[in-house]
Amino acid sequence: MIKLSEKGVFLASNNEIIAEEHFTGEIKKEEAKKGTIAWSILSSHNTSGNMDKLKIKFDSLASHDITFVGIVQTAKASGMERFPLPYVLTNCHNSLCAVGGTINGDDHVFGLSAAQRYGGIFVPPHIAVIHQYMREMMAGGGKMILGSDSHTRYGALGTMAVGEGGGELVKQLLNDTWDIDYPGVVAVHLTGKPAPYVGPQDVALAIIGAVFKNGYVKNKVMEFVGPGVSALSTDFRNSVDVMTTETTCLSSVWQTDEEVHNWLALHGRGQDYCQLNPQPMAYYDGCISVDLSAIKPMIALPFHPSNVYEIDTLNQNLTDILREIEIESERVAHGKAKLSLLDKVENGRLKVQQGIIAGCSGGNYENVIAAANALRGQSCGNDTFSLAVYPSSQPVFMDLAKKGVVADLIGAGAIIRTAFCGPCFGAGDTPINNGLSIRHTTRNFPNREGSKPANGQMSAVALMDARSIAATAANGGYLTSASELDCWDNVPEYAFDVTPYKNRVYQGFVKGATQQPLIYGPNIKDWPELGALTDNIVLKVCSKILDEVTTTDELIPSGETSSYRSNPIGLAEFTLSRRDPGYVSRSKATAELENQRLAGNVSELTEVFARIKQIAGQEHIDPLQTEIGSMVYAVKPGDGSAREQAASCQRVIGGLANIAEEYATKRYRSNVINWGMLPLQMAEVPTFEVGDYIYIPGIKAALDNPGTTFKGYVIHEDAPVTEITLYMESLTAEEREIIKAGSLINFNKNRQM
């Protein structure tokens, strides 16, 4: 079904894959690297003149309503006067959260006023989810788009799209660049044709299951090529493509064909089509060979999209597999709540409590059509099981309504909702306690569906394709593979109508900036002042997390908490609240120590500094010139969302560093850097504990020599001082200065002086 090459490969024009060690052609590997689609797009957007060290200018930007407020505030504080490139502000994340009174609506009005003031594009609530709007109206062949959402992926249309934290978008708004080393490029070589009952989520989950745990494509570009591409509709490709984020890849791109041309022309943008193919001989750093005809209906069980099984395999081994998930749930809940699954097995079938088809992965036209085909004339039943369907945009919704598909779904008992990303991150349709929800959405991290373990609640999500979800719904909630039905061939041609966008979307980039005032609600606050880095620092260990991976959902919860993202200090109260509830108070206490230092008082750390002065070479350290900050240790932090708040929330309550064995994603590490924190790493198992201090002398010099090791000294409460070895991976010159300045905002202010 899926095979991974052990080394690099050459791809010939006849689709022959040649292992690097067996290649005998004349072209050199370095020259053949230029034959990938990724090279052609990156080179056309690179401004550095050096393809090893890229400085990328994007064609457009995209943000939604739980990220754009902070981005605009940061850019404004950094001197921005107008949006220099098309910037789309959508309102698809907190648009249904009944949290905090007016705060969500206030964010939306702020977004509209920002689009009017600076010349942006504003998509009101319920009109479209961010990535469907970008597909329909912005993406095209050979383009690059940067979004403040990790699922920013438009590769099937020939666009290399990247999800990053808000700081990287701010740089583009200030006419700066996205700076990275040239990434590895991995071919995803598709052959065959999927069975009619196999959908895009099945293909995506199979790939994720094969590459996530071994890091095969981490921070690399996935380039989809091969004869199997032409067997897939553009809708199908889009739904596979958006899930590549869950592999931890950097970006994605597909070869394009007349099918893509027709799709863009249908949306009134045929001129944005560009035929993209690898050169006759192209070199890839790896190859994922996918036989589409061998893919079966899949399920990703809690608590990660990589926890993948064939549905048939699960149904044949329910007891063993479900017990493994129950054991994992006990670890995830830390004894605060319980999830039981074996009690949901009735007569040898797993009974689920909810089905959801939504968002940029599930809510697309063909997925909803498939669900309707399975449910036409059927019933979801009148027990606990329920089904909700969220079309991904109003144009999609409108065509489904015109074709009678909405009526078919409603008649079967499904609930039809507007374009909303809530089920993807816990802001809508939270299941019942101890419930299992099957969803065609993007993620199934712990508690991302909205449950609150601190309140004794635990529910979970399994990811599936819309086809198998609909088959399950037609079977009253008993887990059913789409292969058990034969109803998948009737897919009427989609008719796109731009009228909802013409009537509701504010096109400020065309109209230009008006310089009218921004409209602030009472919850929208400016970023607090942050201090610059000193030569020597003291870190207090405020959290130590030894889980294999720490997600951004654990660092700062999603769901209703997201509504507070316009208030940096208010949101920070929720930092690590589900994983380490004592962290916030410990970090705030450390921040108070720093405030006292700035006021000339370090008396509370007299003993700590006395022990530091006993370290050879540190006898003359000045405590008043030594910054004090909190630190989080995690083995592998940052899997998941691009949200900059995963880092900023630590920073605004005293955070000064992370220490990790490795960082799960480039985007989280960038967020740490842009918020003025040190992205420290250590190979050894940490011996420090929460409450210990770590003294690091000469940290500015260490910043100027990334990749080299340097010493830290652990000040234990009741033990001798011990040495640890730290390092930082590659940092650009600008990133080093951002950390020294204390934040991206400070760095930009310094440049204006």
Curated annotation (Swiss-Prot):
Give this protein's Gene Ontology molecular function annotations: 4 iron, 4 sulfur cluster binding; aconitate hydratase activity; metal ion binding
Q: Which domain of life is it from?
A: Bacteria
> Which residues are involved in binding [4Fe-4S] cluster?
C360, C421, C424
Quote the cellular component terms of the Gene Ontology held in the record. Answer: cytosol
What does this protein need as cofactor? [4Fe-4S] cluster
Task: Kindly state which keywords UniProt assigns to this record, in alphabetical order.
Answer: Iron, Iron-sulfur, Metal-binding
The name this protein carries in UniProt is Uncharacterized protein YbhJ
This chain's source organism reads Escherichia coli (strain K12)
The gene designation is ybhJ
